[in-house]
A protein has these predicted regions:
Chain A
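N-terminal basic/disordered segments at the start of proteins
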Residues: 1-39
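Conserved glycine-rich phosphate/nucleotide-binding loop
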Residues: 11, 17-20, 132, 141, ...
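Short acidic (Asp/Glu) and glycine-rich catalytic loops that position anionic groups and cofactors
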Residues: 20-26, 173-177, 223-229
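Alpha/propeptide regions of enzymes that mature by internal proteolysis
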Residues: 2-5, 32-120, 186-274, 283-290
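Glycine-rich anion/phosphate-binding loop at the beta-strand->alpha-helix junction
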Residues: 90-186, 190-193
Length: 290, 488
């Protein structure tokens, strides 16, 4: 018998859903009764999320082109989000966090009448914004440093509902060295996989300052198998930082052109680049409306 | 479960993996790894909750509940002073323990004007560090010099103490305030040091160090042997009687107070004849000189390579040919013997057989040089909040010694003043007690031990009190099966 999903409120009133490795922080705005209905619906949906994923886990850990057709809606979201990138190595697991957030936010938003709602799954955020409202997402320059360097304001007119961040030092392994890549996209699953892939490309290739390790040595069940993931990053020259960012920017631009993402911020050692409709100069304590 | 998974199970168990049952993923965890949640790991083939007794960081006032495990049983239950009337509580025991534990890396905080933050870690702050005492008089760097690890600043050289150099490492600014990389380097160094593993440090403009709790420091590649027995003047006082008959003059060279035997009170009392020796530096009181040498990595931990550098010509009216001079460091590790020639110039000669024991006596009375590491951390409001309805009562109770604070079962010193800021000798804390979250922050155990009566008087959550036997059964059943110690 394994542990069940847990639903609890943080002391500030936000909802915390946790099961195994999944932690969701959820906040709804609206009438108390509507919030309560939405929280109940999301908690109820969450109860079976991990069990559903586990049933298909073996398939979801394979390269997306070799994954079985998915049964659960979350697994389907994962496959849909990742199969767009069949020209490089990616498994549906690259979109797992965003897909869970998308599923839960969808349940909450449709269960009652809310003004706004967000579901934050470890930095991968799905949200919905009602008319006249806005959701403000803080932007950081590193996945492990919560200092804000900017804010993204999303209104009901935004055609984006997902933001995700990936980088070296976070929970997931990366082939790259980005401190943080934040991607804005139409849903959290799309943002999640794009952030992962762009972060993989913020790279100097084989480099003496970048130590790597086989992914399955640090996590035996890693979907990345024996591929080499970054284990430490030493001192980099200004030029090396810019080169690595250039490589990521190129990847992000291609995604923007294809329309799979709306925009991205890439950060490495204090240098920040942006791709999309905004300028970097807006970043520092700036307001990027969307 | 499909059949093929069962086959996998047998194969994987063979490799020393354990299967976690904490959630439906049921990870197979290889030795020394954690499952996909990072909350459970395989420690020596035993499935182990990786959370220490509690999480020692400030989780901000909001959303800061953490639910620890009550007992790091395999490591220290034999040592802790637990009587049947005593409950051990971790912080946060009022929540739905033990099933519910927000992982430290998702504990969230609110930023003004921001709904949510797109970062793996939300608002974790760490208030902890280590104070390092390195038993050496060698110069490791100027006070206030930065101490670097992995090329990043993680602390500084603090004010020197008796026979030792002090480092102050970590602290909230180094963990969170400078750059991500310096925070990570700080976190790694702190964790390694607290876990009693060796860490390489570089003092800016100073020495390279390899330090490890409970072992001799390695300074610029040389392992330090002895802590000095006292300053130069004190050494003269201690050993004057033994020198009286075998030499005419002794200079105990010391960066702080260099001692000269015949001028010193000890020599005077013994009626020793003034030698006419003249030292550079500044005479403080008879036989006690300041500023003779600077700290360094040369002769006897000073900046000189030849002790004669500190001598000026002997006074011809007082000195005499054949005068026997011993110059020795405060640990006895450096010693030279001279005899004045007809021109009153000191001529280097081997240490005579009757002088050697007096030098050895200095070393014999020195203690071995060690590195000692004290972990210092503060238990803020959120840590206390889970324990009682009124956190301040817990603080007062600690002040009144009604509640005993321990760190992994080890005794702590509680700083006067606000909060519960404690210091603990890391060598007394069981191995594996310290960890980290990538925030970066250090995770360390802390226990509050209080009698049931006082616990309830504190406004403690009575319903949360559980019998020790229940806790052990519920949380450590696998340990109980594996560790024969507990079934005896």
């Amino acid at each position: 018998m394994t542990g069940a999903a847990v639903s609890a409120f943080l002391s500030d009133g936000r909802l915390h859903l946790q099961h195994g490795p999944i932690d969701l922080i959820i906040e709804a705005h609206g009438d108390a009764k509507d919030i309560s209905i939405a929280y109940d619906a999301m908690a109820k949906r969450f109860e079976t999320v991990l069990d559903e994923l586990v049933l298909e886990l073996t398939s979801l850990r394979r390269e997306v082109s070799k994954a079985d057709s998915a049964k659960s809606p979350i697994a389907r979201r994962m496959i849909v989000a990742t199969e767009k990138y069949n020209d490089e190595f990616v498994t549906p697991m690259a979109a797992v966090a965003g897909s869970v957030a998308d599923e839960i936010v969808q349940i909450g938003w449709t269960s009652s009448s809310l003004k706004k709602l967000y579901v934050n799954n470890g930095g991968d955020i799905a949200f919905r914004v009602g008319s006249g409202e806005e959701v403000v997402v803080g932007l950081t320059k590193s996945v492990i440093d919560p200092t804000l360097i900017g804010r993204l304001h999303f209104s009901s007119k935004s055609n984006v509902c997902g933001v995700a961040t990936s980088g070296f030092g976070g929970r997931s392994r990366t082939f790259g060295i980005a401190d943080a890549v934040t991607v804005i996209s139409s849903c959290a699953a799309d943002a999640d996989v794009a952030a992962t892939l762009i972060a993989n490309h913020v790279s100097l290739g084989s480099h003496p300052q970048v130590k790597v390790v086989a992914a399955n040595l640090v996590d035996a069940t890693s979907d990345l198998g024996d591929r080499l993931v970054t284990s430490s990053v030493g001192n980099l020259t200004k030029q090396e930082i810019e080169t690595a960012l250039d490589n990521g920017v190129e990847k992000a631009r291609a995604m923007c052109t294809r329309g799979t993402i709306e925009g991205a911020f890439l950060a490495l050692r204090g240098s920040v680049r942006s791709v999309g409709k905004f300028h970097c100069s807006y970043l520092v304590d700036g307001k990027v409306s969307w | 479960m499909p059949d093929h998974d069962l086959n996998v199970e047998e194969e994987q168990i063979d490799e020393g993996k354990v299967r976690c049952e904490a959630c439906p993923i049921r990870c197979f965890i290889k030795p020394e790894q954690t499952g996909s949640c990072d909350r459970y790991g395989n420690v020596d083939g035993v499935l182990t909750r990786m959370d220490p007794v509690t999480v020692l960081h400030i989780t901000n006032k909001r959303g800061g509940s953490v639910v620890p495990f009550a007992l790091n049983a395999e490591s220290w239950s034999g040592e802790a002073s637990i009587s049947p009337e005593v409950v051990i509580i971790g912080s946060g025991s009022g929540t739905t323990y033990p099933d519910y534990k927000p992982a430290p890396f998702i504990v969230s905080s609110l930023h003004d004007g921001v709904d949510t933050v797109t970062v793996v870690t939300e608002g974790i702050f760490s208030y902890c560090g280590v104070k390092v005492k390195i038993d050496t008089d060698r110069h490791i760097g100027d006070e206030r010099s930065l101490v670097m690890h992995e090329g990043e600043p993680i602390g500084h050289v603090s004010t020197a103490e008796y026979g030792s150099q002090m480092l102050s490492l970590g602290g909230v600014h180094h963990l969170t305030g400078i750059t991500k990389h310096s925070g990570l380097a700080t976190m790694r160094a702190l964790e390694e040091l607290c876990e009693k593993r060796a860490v390489e440090l570089q003092v800016e403009g100073g020495a390279s160090l390899i330090i490890q709790a409970g072992t001799a420091p390695v300074i610029n590649g040389v392992e330090e042997q002895l802590m000095r027995v006292g300053c130069g003047s004190a050494s003269v006082g201690m050993f004057a009687g033994q020198w009286q008959d075998v030499v005419d003059e002794v200079v105990v060279v010391d960066e702080h107070i260099t001692g000269v035997l015949t001028e010193h009170q000890a020599g005077a009392v013994l009626g020793m004849r003034p030698s006419g020796i003249k030292l550079r530096g500044r005479r403080s009181t008879p036989g006690r000189y300041f500023n003779v040498v600077e700290p360094g990595i040369g002769w006897g931990g000073t900046n000189i390579s030849d002790p004669l550098e500190i001598l000026q010509p002997f006074k011809p009216k007082l000195a005499w040919p054949g005068l026997r001079l011993l110059m020795v460091s405060t640990t006895g590790d450096a010693a030279e013997y001279f005899v004045l020639n007809d021109k009153l110039e000191p001529i280097r000669q081997p240490l005579p057989d009757d002088v050697i024991p007096t030098v050895e006596q200095i070393g014999f009375n020195c203690e071995p040089a060690l590195t000692s590491i004290v972990f210092m951390a503060g238990a803020g409001g959120s840590l206390r909040a889970g324990t009682t309805n009124s956190p301040i009562r817990l603080t007062k109770s600690v002040r009144n010694a009604q509640t005993i604070v321990t760190c992994g079962g080890a005794p702590v010193y509680i700083w006067p003043g606000g909060g519960i800021t404690f210091m603990v000798d890391v060598e007394k804390v069981p191995p594996g007690s310290f960890g980290h979250v990538p925030t970066p922050a250090i995770v360390a155990p802390i226990e509050f031990t209080v009698s049931r009566e006082n616990f309830i008087a504190l406004g403690g959550h009575e319903k949360s009190i559980r019998q020790m036997s229940d806790v052990l059964l519920a949380e450590r059943v696998r340990h109980l099966e594996h560790k024969e110690f507990y079934t005896q």
